[in-house]
Amino acid sequence: VYSSCQKSKAQKSVYPNHVGDTAFDEKIDDPNFKVCTTGRIPQYYEFGKSLQFKGEKPAIDKHFEILKQNESTAESGYITIRFIVNCEGKTGRYRIEEMNNDYQPMSFDKKLVEKILTLTKELSGWIVGGNTEQPVDYYQYLTFKIEGGKLIEIMP
């Protein structure tokens, strides 16, 4: 029986710490946006609260009201924008997922997606996660239900 006493070098993982972690991407992310939490960033619903926004869902619905008058198109499905709210209530690391009504990947009109992303980035009023003694970053998402090119509903 042979055994080796050589120590193997620790390999650096190419995977995020947790499924769904959004790593900084210098091509698309704002370098001035900083996360405060080291390690795992929780999801918004892990605080046992609903949507963490001043004015809650009615304020978000009002902000996106303009999309209900959008031009009619044949496009229907869902556009989800996921992002991080940091311990200062600032947002960054936006990611977009587009899918049809059967939850299969698709691409919506770029102008519509850009308009939704811009309006999402303009939202101010995100409530800091955690508590006053120890604020934390968290992941938030907004899913936009689109029918015929028009906004029907925003979830959560």
Which residues make up each language-model segment?
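Charge-biased low-complexity segments
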Residues: 6-156
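C-terminal motif of bacterial Sec signal peptides marking the signal peptidase cleavage site
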Residues: 2-4
